[in-house]
């Protein structure tokens, strides 16, 4: 059978289910897929987590390296988030340098961590203006079945929350790192993102891949532990009317607390 015809049939099935008040996988419109988190899965990383969100699966590793502070923040450490989307995870992903999807994914996670002030960057300064810890958060997608944003945020904050920082001291202008002598990374918050797909006038929490293919637009809302919205990212070309935007943000704020409880219970 023609692949385009198969795609049209599947699109019709997904849309028909939504219009009937259902979803293709049987969930309610406001329901997340099952969330599984396993922390500490990479022995050589300073922190790590494996996340399953339905059939979406990814692993996040945190690695700390000694670097130089930025000139405009000489008393702070640095944060760098990277995402790797490989063909093994989804045929639509291409090998090579990060594409626009990987870059957007990295930026959404980075912004959520920064704007929530999850990490106390000042605690990562070793010597003001000279040496600091650079925190690398690397996201590796293993299986893509939709909503990489929320899965990546869950994995990143989970990995950071168990990260251990080696003690370091400066001797004769050189940084000596004591790998076996560590302390927990200073954490101030536990941000959670909630992604909502808009299909017509319908709002779907945690869209699976089949729903992402037909959605008009997407909103990813990152929420702090206190319930404050700290970051919002809109995706795709469709519009988001004001009344639906308000509904989406309210819904995201409510769901973020549920997801946070689920994740923390597994750490």
Swiss-Prot record:
Pfam families linked to this entry: RNase_PH (PF01138), RNase_PH_C (PF03725)
Superkingdom of the organism of origin: Archaea
Keywords attached to this entry: Cytoplasm, Exosome
Keyword Transmembrane applies: no
Gene3D superfamilies named among the record's database cross-references: GHMP Kinase, N-terminal domain (3.30.230.70)
GO MF term list: mRNA 3'-UTR AU-rich region binding
Example of a GO cellular component annotation carried by this entry: cytoplasmic exosome (RNase complex)
Major location category of this protein: cytoplasm
GO annotation, biological process: rRNA catabolic process
Subcellular location(s) per record: Cytoplasm
Keyword Cytoplasm (UniProt): yes
Family: Belongs to the RNase PH family. Rrp42 subfamily.
Role of this protein: Non-catalytic component of the exosome, which is a complex involved in RNA degradation. Contributes to the structuring of the Rrp41 active site.
Subunit structure: Component of the archaeal exosome complex. Forms a hexameric ring-like arrangement composed of 3 Rrp41-Rrp42 heterodimers. The hexameric ring associates with a trimer of Rrp4 and/or Csl4 subunits.
NCBIfam families: PRK04282.1-1
PANTHER family: EXOSOME COMPLEX COMPONENT RRP42, EXOSOME COMPLEX EXONUCLEASE RIBOSOMAL RNA PROCESSING PROTEIN
Protein name: Exosome complex component Rrp42
Species: Methanopyrus kandleri (strain AV19 / DSM 6324 / JCM 9639 / NBRC 100938)
């Amino acid at each position: 059978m023609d692949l385009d015809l198969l795609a049209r049939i599947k699109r019709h099935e997904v849309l028909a289910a939504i219009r009937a008040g259902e979803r293709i996988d049987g969930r309610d419109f406001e329901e997340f897929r099952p969330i599984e988190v396993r922390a500490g899965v990479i022995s050589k990383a300073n922190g790590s987590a494996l996340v399953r969100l339905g059939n979406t699966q990814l692993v996040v590793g945190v690695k700390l390296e000694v670097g130089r502070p930025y000139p405009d923040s000489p008393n702070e450490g640095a944060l760098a988030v990277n995402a790797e989307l490989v063909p093994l995870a989804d045929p639509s992903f291409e090998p090579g340098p990060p594409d626009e999807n990987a870059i957007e994914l990295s930026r959404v996670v980075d912004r959520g961590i920064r704007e929530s002030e999850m990490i106390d960057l000042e605690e990562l300064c070793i010597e003001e203006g000279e040496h600091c810890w650079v925190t690398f958060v690397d996201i590796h997608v293993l299986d893509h079945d939709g909503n990489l944003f929320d899965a990546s945020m869950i994995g990143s904050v989970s990995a950071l929350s168990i990260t251990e920082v080696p003690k370091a001291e400066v001797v004769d202008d050189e940084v000596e790192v004591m790998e076996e002598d560590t302390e927990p990374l200073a954490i101030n918050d536990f941000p959670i993102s909630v992604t909502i797909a808009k299909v017509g006038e319908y709002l779907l929490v945690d869209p699976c891949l089949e729903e992402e293919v037909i959605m008009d637009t997407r909103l990813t809302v990152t929420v702090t532990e206190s319930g404050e919205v700290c970051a919002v990212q809109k995706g795709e070309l469709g519009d988001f009317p004001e009344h639906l935007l308000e509904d989406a943000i309210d819904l995201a704020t409510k769901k973020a607390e549920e997801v946070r409880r689920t994740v923390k219970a597994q750490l």
